[in-house]
Amino acid sequence: MAALDQQPLLHDGGDQKPPPEGAARRFRRCRTAPSSEPPPTDKDNSSAADAPPKTLFTGGGRPSFRLVGLLLVAYLLLGTIAFYLAMDHMSGTRTTRALDALYFCVVTMTTVGYGDLVPASDAAKLLACAFVFAGVAVVGTFLSKAADYLVEKQEALLFRALHSHTMVRAMEMNKVRYKLYTAGLLLVAAVASGTVVLWKVEGMRAVDAFYCVCATVTTLGYGDRSFSSEGGRAFAVAWITVSTVVVALFFLYAAELYTERRQRELARWVLRRRTTNMDLEAADLDGDHRVGAADFVLYKLKELGKISQEDISEFLDEFDNLDADHSGTLSPADLAAAQPTPDPPPSLR
């Protein structure tokens, strides 16, 4: 009986050995959590739809730009066909019908808008308006993917800054720096190639060629200089698309490198800063003058800007709603009681 009294109240079924002195302590699953899932119900069929989206932090990998590529191909294909059929209603410098249609489609999508080839009839103007908004949607999709990549990259950077070794962090920083250098070299190559083509093929002066290239890659498109020959427009179809994407990637990687540095500096400052009595008071969420591991982690996450007090309050409200017996813990019975009662079949009503 005495031996039974000395056993722990909560026992996992295996021998638990105390960790050696000085060993790192690991957070384990809360013992009050259910060891198995409750029986499946009809509501479980929608669990896949309720699953959170995959990110870099949760193992989803880098956001795919496949959708952007498909939209780009579809836009260029439909736009070329549409403007090919409407080419009789266009005015400006003309070369060949198909090449001019593709050239005008690319200039419209990238919002360069030289003005050397413009719609002349009402039908052509309405068609151009439709493809202007469609092109902006394609560019917006690319920017949204880039923004998602930056946000998810921040999650991965925070995790690595808190858990990885110094050498691994340096390798990740160098990887971003190399991507920025590569994009910079591609940008220089795009500017140089465009300048040479405008100088040699279009017959512009070197300064005018460089001026037109800068106005093009930044999608400014003043319109006083543009591609007018058949060879120049054939080059411009691929060059304008590639150069504008390279510029966007260059600034994306520059923002990523800057964000990564700021994130690492913030994580390093939080980890190295000494915890004071004021920090303990701020971390004491329940006001019992004791700060547990969960309270401390939440305080550090708030300090890093990864979670706010509003988020914590929402989570606590959800916990209170699920805690049917008000025991302070969750069990399968609490979850079953919190589930709404399904409507009976129409035949039983």
Curated annotation (Swiss-Prot):
Membrane topology listed for this record: Multi-pass membrane protein
GO biological process, one term: potassium ion transmembrane transport
Amino-acid positions noted as binding Ca(2+) 2 in the UniProt annotation, renumbered to this chain: 323, 325, 327, 329, 334
Subcellular location, record wording: Vacuole membrane
Function: Highly selective inward-rectifying potassium channel that is specifically located in the tonoplast of protein storage vacuoles. Functions independently of the voltage difference across the membrane.
PANTHER family listed in its UniProt record: IP11374P (PTHR11003:SF291), POTASSIUM CHANNEL, SUBFAMILY K (PTHR11003)
Protein known as: Two pore potassium channel b
Naturally occurring in which organism (per UniProt): Oryza sativa subsp. japonica (Rice)
